[in-house]
Amino acid sequence: KSLTKGMAIHGIFGSTGSALGPLLATTLAALISWRSAYAFLGIFNAILAVGTYLTIPYRKRSEIPEEEFANHNINTNKPALIFYFLANGFMGMAYYGFTTFMPLHFAENTTSILPNLTENMKAGLFPTMVFIAGIGGQIIGARIGERFHKPTALMYIIMANIPFLILMGYTSDIFLIISGIFLGIAYFSNQPIGNTLIANFTNSQNRGIGYGFSFFISFGIGSFAAGFSGLIAENMGVAAVFPAMGILLIPSVLFAFLMSRAARSS
């Protein structure tokens, strides 16, 4: 339980950064130039990298006794882990798909909301609201992970994303914003559970590899969805991207179901 809470706290700070990023970038672009937004974020990350290196203590693996590893496991549940990676890959593709075009979609389809704001400001403001909602999703995900069978809970969380992605493609103005907020809650609630599952499925000594491979699949392979979504947006319109990402989650639900079965049988 404490591990799931820890993952939620970690995710909350990540969602906070994701929420502030678009708003900060669009504000700097509007007040100065788009180059200033990139420059500021680059300098900030350089400072953050130095601070991380100086403040986080380093311990060699050989110095850490086995019993000190959280969720100490001696075996890896390979079938469950593989199915999780596959489910996470499709989740990553959906994430890259909808986040790539979410700013443009909000800018073009919220004409009656805050009409005095420019499209550029709306492209930063409304995605920020979605990511702020993700903070609530992290908390909800942690509570769900504490109370229910985590692999099964993840399957239902993935399913919950599908209707909100579809709604985002067919709504505008206030209903679009509401759909986006619920999507933020639904999507980010998967993170504390998913990260805990990696810890549950992996050998304690190989856990870092498990997390690294998971991020590679989600953010590396998942990034290909940006190009795929671009083809959809060019040929069918930006709004069509969101239902397409919802359809993309159907295989993710299937792999999450298989993961749940593999986890129960171990």
Predicted regions and their residues:
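Symmetry-related core transmembrane helices of the 12-TM Major Facilitator Superfamily/SLC fold
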Residues: A37-L54, F242-F257
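Small-residue (Gly/Pro/Ala) motifs that create kinks and tight helix-helix packing interfaces
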Residues: G17-A29, P103, A225-A233
